[in-house]
Every structure is written in C-alpha cells, then in structure tokens.
Amino acid sequence: MQIMATQNSKSNIFWSSSASVVLVLLLLVDVGVCQNCGCNGLCCSQYGYCGSGEAYCGAGCKEGPCSSSSPPSTGTGVGSIVSSDVFNSIVGGAASGCAGNGFYTYDSFISAANAFNGFGTSGSSDVNKREIAAFFANAAHETGGFCYIEEQNPTSIYCDASNTQYPCASGKTYHGRGPLQLSWNYNYGAAGSYIQFDGLNNPEIVGTDSTISFKTAVWFWMVNSNCHTAITSGQGFGATIRAINSMECDGGNAATVASRVNYYQKFCQQLNVDTGSNLQC
C-alpha cells in the first residue's frame, strides 16, 4: 500500500529540515568564531578555523600544534623564499664540532614556518625577505652562527618561582635552548601550551627535537613578542633587537647589536633584498 504524505506532514518535514539547516549553520558559526585563526593553543585548519583534532590539526593545518605528517611544502610560502641551498648557506657555517651542526635542518625550519600563519608571508616580497633575514640574523647571533643548541655555561636555572601559571618542575632548568634561546619557565610553559609539548616537565626536548626547537623560535617571533609586527610594519631591524633583548639597546651593548646587524646585512644580501632603514636600536 502506497503511503501518501499529507499537507501537514509535508509542512512538518519542511520545518524539520529547515530547523536542521539552521542548527548546522549555528554550529558552524560557533566553530568559526575564531575564523582566520590566531587562537592560543589551537590549530588553524586549512579553511581558517580554530579547533583541535585531525580536522583542524591534520592535512592543510596552517598554524598552531599541527599534526600533519605530510612533507613540508617548499614551493610556496616561506619555502619559495628560502630554498634548501639558501638555508644551508645561512646555517651551514657551523664547524663540524658544533652541537648545532646537523641539528638545524631545512625540513624542520619549513615545518615550523608553515605552522604559523603570516610568518614570512604577510607582506610584499621585500618585506617577507627582510622578515626571514631578520629572524635568521637574531637566531645566528643567539646561537653563535648556529653552532650552539643550548646556552653555554648558564649561571641560572631561569626559574621564576613567583609565576604560578607555569610553575617550575623539580630538577628542571629553563636555560636558553633553540634558535632564539627560549628561556624561563613561563616561556617554556606558554610555548609548550601553544605548540603542544610539555615545556615544564620536558624542557630538554627544545634541545633535542629540531622541529620543536624551530617552532619555539617562530612562536616567540610571532606570538610572544612584537618581532613580526615590527619588521613587517616598517619599524626596521632594530625594533626586533629591542623586542628580543632591550637591554642591548640605547648603548647597553653596542657589540651585540653590531653582531646582529652584521648578520642581518649578510642575510639580506643572500636573499637579494635591501636592508631597509633603522637597523640599530
């Protein structure tokens, strides 16, 4: 026997379907509150939404604690500016006996760079090249030309006991590690929360995992300081020095400022871009 829908049942079906569509749209709006990303501790999906899980952190993930196992893209984004040859010319000067020799790899850098939306990709070609040169210049200075992974002969465990949000773990030290020498428990804790590693209980991973090491440096550059804004808004390389170590500026340590500037000029030349103005701080 054929069942015929009555007018009322058709109406009910219509309103039920409409309600379902509205509900789905509301859910999408709720998920998309952080559209275009920048949400602390979450992944930015390939469609520009913040969240967690494979749909957000998997293939196409743009920034945050991405888990995609896909090989890093080297033809677009930062990879189109920094080829493996250019990268090796920048970091390859470390002597064979240096701990950093072989640690700072191209694939790790590209993976870290691609995890942060806008890093080296948010401006004109010249602006993007200057940002990459500025990042590497400060990293080269901090690591002795990429010779070191960890701070040499630290005189402190860099534990701020007054910081209750990121309390120090017993027996752990939070001395400088990685390209920008991540230091202090509160920075390890915050970076770990954003990138998703245990920065407080396992700070050593910043000195043993090349990708995480680079990610902490790009995190500091993009999230924890105004380095990215400074170099992309025309404030000049000197503003990145002030953001990283303001004590060097205004005559505080002319030699270290000169070291950073020399690296910056060298890397700008390698990337075929002028340095811009305001190199000192």
From Swiss-Prot:
Describe how it is modified after translation: The N-terminus is blocked.
Q: In which tissues is it expressed?
A: Expressed in pollen (at protein level).
Q: What class of enzyme is it?
A: hydrolase
A GO MF annotation of the entry reads: endochitinase activity
> Which keywords label this protein?
Allergen, Antimicrobial, Carbohydrate metabolism, Chitin degradation, Chitin-binding, Disulfide bond, Fungicide, Glycosidase, Hydrolase, Plant defense, Polysaccharide degradation, Secreted, Signal
Which Enzyme Commission number(s) are on file for it? 3.2.1.14
GO cellular component assignments: extracellular region
What CDD domains does UniProt report for this protein, alphabetically? chitinase_GH19, ChtBD1
Q: List cystine links.
A: 34-44, 37-50, 43-57, 61-66, 98-147, 159-168, 249-281
**What family does the entry list?**
Belongs to the glycosyl hydrolase 19 family. Chitinase class IV subfamily.
Q: What is known of its domains?
A: Contains an N-terminal substrate-binding domain (CBM18) and a GH19 catalytic domain. The CBM18 domain is involved in binding of the insoluble substrate chitin nanofiber. The CBM18 domain is not required for catalytic activity, but possesses antifungal activity.
| Protein name as catalogued | Endochitinase 4
Q: What is the native source organism of this protein? A: Cryptomeria japonica
